[in-house]
């Protein structure tokens, strides 16, 4: 092999190797930032179509309704724990260590993002509450088949949520 051909071959191999390295780094970065959306039932039983269940330590988003009577606050910190359920009957526990949104209350639709710490338990890093009584996040509405109904709240529940 003459020197000119050898130089071209070395350049081509280096170029292909560089493109492969960049592509693999790009795919790794995209995969680590990917947040999959699940309903509580899908977390417990797996997705209907594929049976895929999230793994412990996986970063996910979950949407559903906050179960009435499930919220437990730590009086000495911002730590709060509550259950989220969907129309199919699945329920998971969500823990959160920050201020909850102003519109957050039991019986409302939410989307929580965080890491699955145990089967059926999510350590949330972000909690989003719906905007008004008619709004439901698109992912939640689609996953629940838009089967949610407006809930009637007692006087005590309305006061606890900050509403009059």
UniProtKB/Swiss-Prot annotation:
For this protein, what is any one GO molecular function term? metal ion binding
Please name the Gene3D superfamilies in this protein's record. Nucleic acid-binding proteins
Question: Which residues are exposed on the Periplasmic face of the membrane?
Answer: 30-164
Q: Where is this region: Disordered?
A: 140-164
Top-rank taxon = Bacteria
The UniProt record lists the keyword Iron: yes
Any transmembrane segments, and where?
9-29
The principal localisation class reads membrane
**Positions of heme binding:** 131, 135
Q: Tell me the residue ranges located in the Cytoplasmic compartment per UniProt.
A: 1-8
Please give the GO cellular component terms listed in this UniProt entry: plasma membrane
The entry sums up its family as follows: Belongs to the CcmE/CycJ family.
What functional role does this protein have? Heme chaperone required for the biogenesis of c-type cytochromes. Transiently binds heme delivered by CcmC and transfers the heme to apo-cytochromes in a process facilitated by CcmF and CcmH.
Q: Name the chain's protein.
A: Cytochrome c-type biogenesis protein CcmE
Task: Please name the source species.
Answer: Shewanella piezotolerans (strain WP3 / JCM 13877)
């Amino acid at each position: 092999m003459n020197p000119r051909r050898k130089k071209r071959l070395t350049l081509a191999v280096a170029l292909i190797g560089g493109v492969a390295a960049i592509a693999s780094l790009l795919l790794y970065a995209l995969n680590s930032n990917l947040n999959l959306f699940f309903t509580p039932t899908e977390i417990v039983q797996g997705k209907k179509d594929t049976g895929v269940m999230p793994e412990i330590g996986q970063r996910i988003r979950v949407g559903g309704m906050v179960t009435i009577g499930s919220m437990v606050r730590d009086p000495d910190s911002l730590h709060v724990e509550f259950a989220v359920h969907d129309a199919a009957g699945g329920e998971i526990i969500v823990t959160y260590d920050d201020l909850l949104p102003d519109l957050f209350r039991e019986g409302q639709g939410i989307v929580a993002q965080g890491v699955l710490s145990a089967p059926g338990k999510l350590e949330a890093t972000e909690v989003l509450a719906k905007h008004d009584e008619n709004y439901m996040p698109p992912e939640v509405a689609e996953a629940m088949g838009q089967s949610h109904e407006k809930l009637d709240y007692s006087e005590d529940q309305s006061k606890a949520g900050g509403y009059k």
